[in-house]
């Protein structure tokens, strides 16, 4: 009650002293003084009706920070006390603030902006009950603009910007405690008329300035402000008419806003003079990089114009044709500035992605042709500049960003064969593809690492450890270039082949020369590293482009040979000699050109052969002890390509295609020598890599991924197991022989997965038995041998014992990852034996966090991969094992003091995994492919006992075990906290009937968790807890037990939610969740609700506030009398609650 207790001069003195403290350097004031000063301002801003005091402060104080706080206090109080204020006093307050700013041109910018924001908030709050409109403000602003005084014009711009910012978004708007729906409604009203008015005022200013020849600095500054304002208007995210509150937030969070105005904007934006003005403005200011960004952004927004503004297709065609003409006139024949690249590419990208294809093709054909030629020229030019940026290692990669956008635009165009005939874009595709290849090859064929003047850049290129792999970093670019390569396959496939063949011949020659030098004089050889490095880099890019051209990266789908590649091979198959093709494919050690008739081979297979030849040169260098000269990156590229290729082409399933190329089906089809040979070759490559490159983790990882590809499809696995070296690999891995035992844990895990998948290939019973004996049995035997030693407890911390245990646990994760519906029976039974032993290991290794973590991970993997296939008795076995694991974990960790941050971090990791385990178990309730243990017939002695325990029971029991471990400190880890509350909410929503049946301690812990989440956690967690309350209250209403613990708990929550909605300032996004919970709780406890309202009203001393509150509550209650769990009534209540919150929401948060 600060303002009421003291006179204005005393208030000013107190605030100015507090401001001095806050502005003082940290060395001059202590924490306590700072907090006291902050408290003074907070208390001042919450004081009741501070308007007179604030006016006095604004007129007399000279301290900027105090002025800023006075403006903020006015803004907050106006909204808070809106229903208590007379219309006249609000109007005079608004006039006072505007006049105040006009009369003080030298105000600090942040103070002026805050005062104008207060004006905008007053206008916004008044727009809804029609008590204030923008007309008078626009009239004032219009006069300010026409004054011709730059300072006054700048102020006019600030007023319009404040209005725009306040109305533009319901999420970025001032936090004035009103609902999303309120902000959405204000925005809709504003965007129809007032926004257009602002745009018209802005356009007038821009027209005036664009006509002037010379602008001084002050004029330029005004021009820039209005251009930025135009950009703000054109980037407005127009709200559609009937969007619910949930969607408003989603709609407004979209990053790239396209221009979709309502019909009422038709006359304004379809006037061709508006578009021409923005092109004129850009031509005038393009050399000023800051202004050019705004003008290009305005044009990019106009290029995205769509929606009801166009009355018909004809108007769209006219607009687009006009725009493209303007664009070509602006950029043809000029040297594009760095600052223009991204803007121009955004304009082109918007034109291509926003305008329907039939509109694009309806513009005059010459104009369209010029547009595509311009796109081709810009793509090649930006590509070259992007390569230069890479060489110069620039921080701001503007050309790279622009190039990416243009390549995406190409992808949109060339994938449309409905509107463009085949071959329409071939010549353009050739140009863009050639330019990409040229930028990525070393001189003399290419321009890689050449600076602008053609000089080679720095010799040694440092590659950071953290740098992303090119194939990931440039995956979008490569996908677009690969697609363009397919469009122009006639040119691109032979080009890649000749470039690769020529480089692999040079690489072979270089390595041979070096070998001869070594033999002639060991130890004295010098290597031309520059030449080798250039070759490796060239081969790297050529393999990446080939991989993206020949195959797609499909996640979870069956990859198909791209139709363009299939058609290209079929078209030329009559010119192809199959035998020569097979000979070239099967002779990676030979130069293609040394094989008679080599020009009559299938071009796609010859391109594959070129890469197999790279692989062969690498293998021969390894055999010749030249590994130190090889590039691990090239090794990675080779196996990455072979994996990608094998997934798509190897043992091609002819049923998936209308027609198939004869060379493909002969070389890689089912039951062919070619496929058997290739599988043998790839397998040998895998084995060689795992021996030679075991220390190169990324390369080893790519290698085992290739192995998984060879066995994940049964048809391929059938051929793999016929190779003798597959069995040798399995034996070698099972016996933990070097060098396989040196592989990193993730690689060993994936290798185990591959070996298990291979075991489900087609074999006779005896062979299959022998295979499992050689792959899985040694794992079991060695594990049991280690843990059953008498002195295992004493030896368990020895390094070799720990390594054995870790390797086994990693292998178990790999086995679980190999689960499929047809192998789950064997794998589950095998893994269950281990799970029981793993629980014993938890005891032994309770003080070895990384082992504990890995044991939990085994359970997580088994549950994740297998639970959905398990019938009741098997699921029970797994539930029991998981609960025993949690019991042991809980017992070992309860009451344990976590001394340092590392220990806390470790427990955080454990608990995160346990949350994942419980969530995986809970998924059984939704995803269940089991057929009463059907998949286990023949593997299951005896019948399941008649037990019926649901996944929910198990998960709740699991929660009970870990709840005591969830300390306040651990809940400070946001990820863990969110996971924990998501799990609890999930259970309450899906199984509310289980909650009342919980043991008393668990029930209390759960209720305490919900209360903690609502009162002390993030708004996201609070929302989750509110969402959990609704189903619990509904469950209570169904059960009609008025003395149950849940009934009593919900009564307590009614008070919490009531206080949150009425007495506390809360995040308005939570109003919906809080409202739904509140309504359900009110239905359940109507008498208590009336009591809460009465208590609140009786505490009000101010009769005006009392009456307003009483009216608001009566209106709220009347919306659903008596409240019942009926959807219609609930919706009516929620709507009234929105209104209630708008009117009295902040009224009681006053000091």
UniProtKB/Swiss-Prot annotation:
GO terms under biological process: positive regulation of protein export from nucleus; protein export from nucleus
Keywords: Cytoplasm, Nucleus, Phosphoprotein, Protein transport, Transport
GO CC list: cytoplasm; cytosol; nuclear pore; nucleoplasm; nucleus
Protein's UniProt keywords contain Nucleus: yes
Keyword Aminoacyl-tRNA synthetase in record: no
Modified residues (Phosphoserine): 464, 521
Subcellular location: Cytoplasm; Nucleus
Annotated S-S bridges: none
Major site of localization recorded for this protein: cytoplasm
Domain of life: Eukaryota
GO MF term (any one): nuclear export signal receptor activity
Extent of the signal sequence: none
InterPro entries, per the entry: ARM-like (IPR011989), ARM-type_fold (IPR016024), XPO1_C_dom (IPR014877), XPO4/7-like (IPR044189)
The protein's role, per its UniProt record: Mediates the nuclear export of proteins (cargos), such as EIF5A, SMAD3 and isoform M2 of PKM (PKM2). In the nucleus binds cooperatively to its cargo and to the GTPase Ran in its active GTP-bound form. Docking of this trimeric complex to the nuclear pore complex (NPC) is mediated through binding to nucleoporins. Upon transit of a nuclear export complex into the cytoplasm, disassembling of the complex and hydrolysis of Ran-GTP to Ran-GDP (induced by RANBP1 and RANGAP1, respectively) cause release of the cargo from the export receptor.
Subunit field text: Interacts with Ran and cargo proteins in a GTP-dependent manner.
Family membership: Belongs to the exportin family.
Name under which the protein is recorded: Exportin-4
Organism field: Homo sapiens
Gene, per the UniProt record: XPO4
């Amino acid at each position: 009650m600060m303002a009421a207790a003291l006179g204005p001069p005393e208030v000013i003195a107190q605030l100015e002293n507090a401001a001095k403290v806050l502005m003082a350097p940290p060395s001059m004031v202590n924490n306590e003084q700072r907090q006291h000063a902050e408290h003074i301002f907070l208390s001042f801003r919450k004081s009741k009706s501070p308007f007179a005091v604030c006016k006095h402060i604004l007129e007399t104080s000279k301290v900027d920070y105090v002025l800023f706080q006075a403006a903020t206090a006015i803004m907050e109080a106006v909204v808070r006390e809106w229903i208590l204020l007379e219309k006249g006093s609000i109007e005079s307050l608004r006039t006072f603030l505007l006049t105040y700013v006009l009369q003080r041109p030298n105000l600090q910018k942040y103070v002026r902006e805050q005062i104008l924001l207060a004006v905008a908030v007053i206008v916004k709050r008044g727009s809804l009950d029609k008590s204030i409109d923008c007309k008078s403000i626009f009239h004032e602003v219009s006069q300010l603009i026409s004054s011709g005084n730059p300072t006054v014009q700048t102020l006019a711009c600030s007023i319009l910007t404040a209005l725009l910012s306040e109305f533009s978004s319901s999420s970025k708007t001032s936090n004035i405690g009103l609902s999303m729906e309120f902000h959405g409604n204000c925005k809709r009203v504003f965007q129809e008329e007032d926004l257009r008015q602002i745009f018209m005022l802005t356009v007038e200013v821009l027209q005036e300035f664009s006509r002037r020849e010379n602008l001084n600095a002050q004029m330029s500054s005004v021009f820039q402000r209005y251009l930025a304002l135009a950009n703000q208007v054109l980037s407005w995210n127009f709200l559609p008419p009937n969007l619910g509150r949930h969607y408003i937030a989603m709609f407004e969070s979209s990053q790239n806003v396209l221009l979709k105005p309502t019909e009422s904007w038709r006359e304004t934006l379809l006037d061709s003079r508006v578009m021409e003005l923005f092109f004129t403005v850009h031509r005038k200011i393009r050399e000023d990089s800051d202004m050019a960004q705004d003008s290009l952004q305005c044009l990019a927004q106009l290029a995205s114009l769509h929606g009801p503004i166009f009355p018909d297709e004809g108007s769209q065609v006219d607009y687009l044709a006009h725009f493209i003409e303007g664009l070509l006139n602006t950029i043809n024949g000029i040297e594009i500035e760095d600052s223009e690249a991204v803007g121009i590419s955004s304009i082109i990208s918007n034109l291509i992605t926003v305008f329907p294809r039939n509109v694009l093709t309806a513009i005059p054909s010459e104009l369209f042709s010029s547009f595509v030629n311009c796109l081709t020229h810009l793509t090649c030019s930006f590509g070259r500049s992007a390569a230069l940026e890479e060489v110069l290692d620039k921080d701001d990669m503007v050309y790279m960003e622009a190039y990416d956008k243009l390549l995406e635009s190409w992808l949109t165009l060339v994938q449309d064969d409905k509107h463009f005939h085949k071959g329409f874009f071939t010549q353009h595709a050739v140009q863009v593809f050639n330019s990409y290849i040229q930028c990525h090859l070393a001189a003399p064929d290419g321009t890689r690492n050449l600076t602008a003047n053609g000089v080679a850049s720095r010799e040694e290129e440092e590659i950071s450890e953290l740098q992303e792999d090119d194939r990931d970093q440039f995956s979008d670019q490569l996908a677009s270039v690969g697609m363009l390569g397919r469009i122009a396959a006639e040119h691109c496939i032979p080009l890649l082949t000749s470039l690769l063949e020529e480089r692999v011949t040079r690489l072979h020659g270089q390595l041979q020369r070096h070998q001869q030098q070594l033999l002639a004089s060991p130890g004295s050889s010098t290597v031309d590293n520059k030449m080798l490095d250039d070759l490796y880099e060239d081969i790297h890019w050529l393999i990446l482009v080939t991989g993206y051209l020949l195959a797609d990266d499909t996640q979870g789908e069956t990859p198909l040979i791209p139709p363009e590649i299939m058609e290209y091979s079929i078209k030329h198959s009559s010119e192809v000699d199959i035998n020569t093709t097979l000979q070239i494919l099967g002779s990676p050690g030979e130069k293609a050109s040394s094989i008679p008739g080599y020009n009559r081979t299938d071009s796609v297979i010859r391109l594959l052969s070129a890469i197999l030849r790279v692989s062969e040169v690498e293998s021969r260098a390894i055999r010749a002890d030249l590994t130190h000269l090889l590039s691990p990156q090239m090794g990675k590229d080779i196996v990455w390509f072979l994996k990608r290729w094998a997934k798509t082409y190897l043992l091609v399933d002819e049923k998936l295609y209308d027609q198939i190329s004869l060379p493909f089906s002969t070389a890689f089809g089912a039951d062919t020598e070619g496929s058997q040979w290739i599988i043998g070759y790839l397998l040998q490559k895998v084995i060689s890599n795992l021996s030679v490159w075991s220390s190169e983790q990324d390369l080893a990882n790519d290698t085992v991924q290739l192995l998984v590809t060879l066995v994940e499809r049964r048809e391929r696995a059938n051929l793999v197991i016929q190779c003798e070296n597959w069995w040798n690999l399995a034996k070698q891995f099972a016996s933990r022989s070097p060098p396989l035992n040196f592989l990193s844990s993730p690689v060993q895990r994936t290798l185990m997965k591959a070996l298990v998948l291979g075991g489900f290939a087609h074999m006779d019973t005896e062979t299959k038995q022998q295979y499992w004996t050689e792959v899985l049995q040694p794992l079991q035997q060695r594990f049991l041998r280690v843990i059953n030693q008498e002195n295992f407890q004493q030896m368990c911390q020895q390094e070799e014992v720990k390594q054995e245990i870790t390797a086994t646990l990693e292998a178990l994760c790999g086995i679980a990852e190999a689960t499929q519906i047809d192998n789950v029976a064997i794998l589950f039974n095998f893994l269950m034996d281990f799970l029981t032993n793993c629980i014993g290991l938890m005891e032994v290794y309770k003080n070895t966090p990384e082992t504990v973590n890995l044991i939990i991970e085994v359970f997580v993997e088994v549950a994740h991969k297998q639970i959905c296939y398990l019938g009741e008795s098997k699921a029970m076995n797994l539930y029991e094992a998981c609960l025993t694991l949690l019991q042991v974990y809980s017992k070992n960790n309860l009451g344990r003091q976590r001394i340092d941050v590392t220990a806390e971090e470790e427990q955080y990791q454990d608990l995160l995994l346990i949350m994942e385990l419980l969530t995986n178990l809970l998924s059984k309730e939704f995803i269940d492919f089991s057929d009463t243990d059907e998949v286990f017939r023949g593997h299951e002695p005896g019948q399941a006992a008649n037990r019926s325990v649901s996944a929910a029971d198990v998960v709740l029991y699991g929660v009970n075990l870990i709840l005591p471990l969830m300390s306040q400190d651990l809940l400070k880890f946001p990820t863990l906290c969110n996971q924990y509350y998501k799990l609890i909410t999930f259970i309450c929503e899906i199984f509310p009937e289980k909650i009342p049946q919980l043991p008393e301690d668990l029930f209390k812990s759960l209720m305490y968790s919900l209360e903690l989440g609502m009162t002390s956690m993030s708004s996201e967690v609070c929302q989750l807890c509110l969402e959990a309350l609704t189903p619990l209250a509904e469950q209570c209403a169904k059960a009609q037990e008025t003395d149950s613990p849940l009934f009593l708990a919900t009564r307590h929550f009614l008070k919490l939610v009531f206080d949150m909605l009425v007495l506390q300032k809360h995040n308005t996004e939570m109003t919906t969740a809080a409202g739904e919970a509140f309504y359900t709780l009110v239905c359940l406890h109507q008498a208590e609700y009336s009591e809460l309202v009465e208590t609140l009203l009786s505490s009000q001393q101010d009769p005006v506030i009392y009456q307003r509150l009483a009216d608001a509550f009566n209106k709220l209650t009347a919306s659903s009398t008596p409240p019942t769990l009926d959807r219609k009534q609930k919706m009516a209540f929620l709507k009234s609650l929105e209104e209630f919150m708008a009117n009295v929401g902040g009224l009681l948060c006053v000091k």
